[in-house]
């Protein structure tokens, strides 16, 4: 990767879960909490919660990632209770367990990613481009990540969502560089890699287990399995 002068990071899935889709982390949390539903039932409640969060303002700007997770788990488990798949009486108890498990998992991933982010921060300007709920600044501050990023481009704030390439164009604009001089690091082929390449950016796809088998089957010359491989690719 030559002539890179700035870097755009995705957040969720890229920095906080080693490229693994967040549904998989939450599913692991369900196992820890001994929530006895099928994977199909879980995926249904996961989608329900995502749509509810998009439709109704539950997440406020001051909420950190634990706050977000607890709200999300209450919605997911509430849905399962409404479907008579779990007992309403256990919703709060189990929501607390899953939220804590997921928050701890995210913090561990963030700390693993920190040396790489730090190394890149020392060499390049960094911008974060994320589909998020309007609270990514609070999430970053809680994980002590905010200072690494020159600017944050968040979907809920700018009114553009991935995979619209315009959200990456805003990130490039924030770096005051040409797209060809920018490396985009993300975990989603459809939401990060394709739109970033559409506007001419270089890419690094941190590929973990995705949401669908179709995405898992996709290949690309710029796949990395760990975030720190970016350091090698950039020759740092």
How would you name each of these model-derived features?
Residues 124:
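Switch/coupling loops of ABC transporter nucleotide-binding domains
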């Amino acid at each position: 990767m030559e002539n890179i002068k700035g870097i755009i990071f995705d957040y969720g899935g890229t920095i906080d879960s080693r490229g693994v889709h967040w549904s998989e982390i939450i599913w692991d949390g369900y196992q820890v909490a001994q929530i006895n539903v099928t994977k199909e039932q879980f995926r249904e409640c996961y989608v329900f919660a995502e749509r509810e969060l998009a439709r109704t303002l539950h997440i406020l700007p001051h909420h950190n990632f634990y706050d977000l997770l607890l709200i999300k788990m209450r919605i997911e488990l509430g849905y399962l209770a409404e479907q008579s798949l779990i007992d309403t009486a256990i919703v709060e108890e189990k929501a607390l367990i899953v939220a804590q498990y997921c928050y701890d998992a995210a913090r561990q991933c963030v700390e693993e990613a920190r040396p790489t982010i730090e190394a890149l921060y020392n060499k390049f300007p960094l911008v974060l481009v994320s589909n998020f709920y309007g609270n990514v600044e609070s999430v970053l501050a809680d994980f002590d990540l905010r200072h690494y990023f020159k600017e944050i481009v968040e979907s809920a704030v700018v009114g553009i969502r991935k995979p619209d390439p315009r959200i990456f164009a805003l990130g490039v604009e924030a770096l005051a560089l040409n797209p060809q001089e920018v490396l985009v690091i993300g975990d989603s082929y459809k939401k990060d890699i394709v739109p970033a390449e559409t506007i001419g950016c270089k890419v690094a796809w941190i590929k973990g287990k995705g949401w669908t088998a179709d995405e898992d089957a996709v290949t690309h010359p710029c796949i990395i399995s760990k975030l720190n491989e970016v350091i090698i690719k950039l020759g740092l």
